[in-house]
């Protein structure tokens, strides 16, 4: 089983590279690979446990939604937050009811089943949208990238609420009062727990120091799970809570945030592989011919009527340009969210005449395969690409090329800085003294501040990062090493190597030619 799982993940990684080369969304490749391994595929893996799939996929979707919030840079998103949140909520409702009306009036489905299909496919998929924007680096005009990211991350809770409420009505257990109570509970507990967990997590992160490396990532992972599980346990909207907590934590000033974003990038990437592969595994291609025509009709109506109408009604009053409306309409990708909600409907006790799961599955395949593939070309044809924009700025792992780095230097009695004022020292251009540590005192210096022997001077400069050119390695010196006892200037190294640091008995030494190497030293060497 472990061997098979490893092979599947490796195949997904390989297909990711292949799909990127041919311009196809990677998530489509994961689904198709799942179908290849499934009951009707080449490898005939028997899997039809919808309940198990729903539980796994719901948690996975919670992680994706949390990451959608955590990775969104609010300073960029807040410029378009008002209209985008209206688009996420009202847009999902309008899309659901328009699609439901089409299913009833044109395809002849039952009213409640029609509305259920509309609700299930009413939200855009954060994983699909993020994947296309990042992989294709779509730098879009008028803040459109931020609109798409914020909408796709925040409209899932609305689709979930609609789906839950309609399923309740289909089972005949919903009254007008029960409908209102369910709606209020979803919103109240979702927002309430999201706010409380966010405040508690921020308080702990800022006051608790994690000594062991990686424990901050473990802590945030636990918070993400808690933000979904707690409100869900009391009838609240776990996805709404997840997104709120993700937004708050992702935009709180905490150390190592970029590393956390990259950690969750990896976790979410693995979750997407698991989720989309599992959805493909669950599908039966042999059952699709009977539903391909209604699925195609719904997909066409959704893409060319329902979604554009909802976007136009909401965005035009905010002064959106027609080409921006066209692009936002086309970028309404359906993905894992819709299929997970379809699984939720399938395992529910509500009676349905149609194969909702496979109908939604086909719609998602068409959406990712056609819309996702053509989105970069569509953006270019609409002249929505702006080379002066950078889509990566809308994500929290973006950092400017001129990121500031800090270094500290201890001033020895024989240093030519000792006893001199800062303004009299010829520092290189671009280097700034930002703080002086003197005994237990922290001094914010001016040009007239005098540096004394024993001071620790903190300097800032523009950072440099390029992992393709430099490799750091450690070298331990034992008593038999040929360098032991020699000065740095006396050792012979290759021309592209340099000793950048020496660890000695818990101290960090920045070497010069006069420094003599000793037994037990750990040399940090860089090579080009």
Regions picked out by a protein language model, each given a short descriptive name:
Residues 1-388, 401:
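Transmembrane helical cores of multi-pass secondary ion antiporters/exchangers
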Residues 309, 316-323, 327, 337, ...:
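Cytosolic regulatory regions of ion transport systems
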């Amino acid at each position: 089983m472990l061997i098979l799982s490893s092979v599947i993940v490796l195949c997904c990684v390989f297909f990711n590279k292949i799909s990127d080369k041919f311009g196809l969304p990677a998530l489509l490749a994961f689904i198709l690979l799942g179908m290849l391994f499934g009951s009707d595929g080449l490898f005939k893996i028997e899997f039809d446990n919808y309940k198990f799939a729903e539980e796994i996929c719901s948690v996975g979707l919670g992680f994706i939604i949390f990451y959608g919030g955590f990775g969104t840079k609010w300073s960029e998103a807040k410029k378009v937050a008002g209209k985008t949140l209206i688009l996420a909520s009202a847009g999902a409702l309008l899309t659901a009811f328009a699609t439901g009306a089409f299913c009833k009036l044109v395809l002849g489905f039952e009213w409640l089943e029609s509305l259920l299909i509309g609700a299930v496919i009413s939200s855009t998929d954060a994983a699909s949208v993020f994947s296309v924007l990042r992989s294709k680096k779509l730098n879009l005009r008028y803040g459109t990238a931020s609109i798409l990211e914020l909408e796709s991350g925040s409209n899932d809770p609305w689709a979930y609420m609609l789906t839950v409420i309609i399923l309740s009505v289909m089972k005949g257990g919903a009254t007008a009062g029960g409908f209102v109570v369910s709606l209020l509970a979803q919103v109240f507990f979702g927002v309430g727990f999201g706010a409380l967990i966010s405040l508690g997590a921020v308080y702990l992160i800022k006051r608790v120091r994690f000594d062991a490396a990686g424990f901050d990532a473990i802590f945030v992972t636990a918070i993400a799970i808690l933000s979904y599980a707690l409100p869900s346990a009391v009838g609240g909207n776990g996805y709404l809570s997840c997104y709120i907590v993700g937004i708050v934590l992702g935009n709180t000033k905490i150390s190592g945030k970029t590393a956390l974003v990259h950690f969750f990038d990896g976790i979410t990437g693995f979750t997407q592989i698991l989720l989309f592969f599992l959805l493909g595994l669950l599908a039966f291609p042999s059952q699709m011919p009977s539903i391909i025509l209604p699925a195609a009709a719904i997909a066409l109506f959704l893409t060319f009527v329902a979604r554009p109408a909802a976007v136009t009604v909401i965005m035009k009053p905010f002064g959106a340009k027609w080409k921006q409306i066209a692009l936002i309409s086309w970028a309404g990708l359906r993905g894992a969210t819709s299929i997970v909600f379809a699984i939720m409907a399938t395992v529910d006790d509500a009676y349905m005449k149609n194969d909702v799961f496979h109908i939604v599955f086909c719609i998602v395949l068409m959406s990712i395969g056609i819309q996702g593939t053509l989105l970069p070309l569509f953006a270019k044809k609409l002249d929505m690409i702006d080379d002066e924009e950078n889509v990566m700025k809308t994500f929290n792992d973006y950092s400017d090329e001129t990121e500031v780095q800090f270094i500290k230097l201890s001033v020895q009695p024989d240093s030519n800085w000792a006893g001199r004022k800062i303004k009299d020292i010829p520092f290189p251009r671009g280097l700034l003294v930002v703080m002086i540590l003197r005994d237990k005192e922290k001094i914010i210096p001016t040009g007239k501040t005098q540096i004394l022997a024993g001071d620790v001077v903190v300097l800032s400069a523009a950072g440099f990062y390029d992992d393709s050119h430099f490799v750091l390695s450690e070298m331990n010196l034992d008593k038999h090493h040929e360098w032991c006892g020699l000065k740095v200037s006396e050792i012979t190294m290759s021309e592209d190597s340099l000793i950048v640091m020496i660890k000695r008995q818990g101290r960090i030494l920045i070497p010069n030619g006069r420094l003599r190497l000793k037994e037990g030293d750990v040399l940090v060497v860089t090579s080009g």
